[in-house]
Amino acid sequence: MTQLDTIQRTVQQLRDLLNKGEIFTALPNMLGKVIESVAVEPATPIKIPRDDKTAIVKIRAIQKRIKQTSDPSVTDDEIDFLVAHLASTNPAVRDKGVFFLFNDLFQAEAFTNEQIKTLFKRLQAPDILFNHIFEPQNNGIFLRSFSLMILSGMIYADQNRYRVLTKADYLATVQNIAVFILLEKEGRGYV
């Protein structure tokens, strides 16, 4: 069992106890113990996209295509490309590129229902939402924090347009966000 699995299980148990009314005043101390139990892991190589110029061209092409059609769509490969580029250290790619494009895609209803479900789960996968989170300060923060920001846009889009995510999907997200908040030590993660 990984450190993340252990913390996920502990947080779920605490949430269950809280929902049963068995803990309340003790919860902050219990969460503090979870935070104190986190072990720093050795740094490992971080996969960061290095194709900034190509990425910007591709992002602009998708933006242009979406704005020029009355029935916008995005391919699964394009979604994978965009998710991978949330890890970019270049703000022109990550912030003004991928992040803005995802929001445009949500607003244009360019995703299929299946793509929404798949992307929602993908952004919460351990290798995305918790990317290098146990290691010393590193650039994995960009993938973590921007995945969380895209999730917030997805939730809004789902509630106002798509309506395909289930109560179980939302509860799993609450769990993951609670764990993220406990684990994120780097201030850039709360931008």
Regions found by a protein language model. Name each.
Residues 2-111:
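N-terminal alpha-helical scaffold/docking segments in eukaryotic complex subunits
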Residues 97-111, 117-125, 133-137:
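N-terminal low-complexity, intrinsically disordered segments
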Residues 107-114, 159-165:
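Short coil/turn connectors between adjacent alpha-helices in alpha-solenoid helical repeat scaffolds
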Residues 119-191:
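Eukaryote-skewed repeat-based solenoidal scaffolds used as protein-protein interaction platforms
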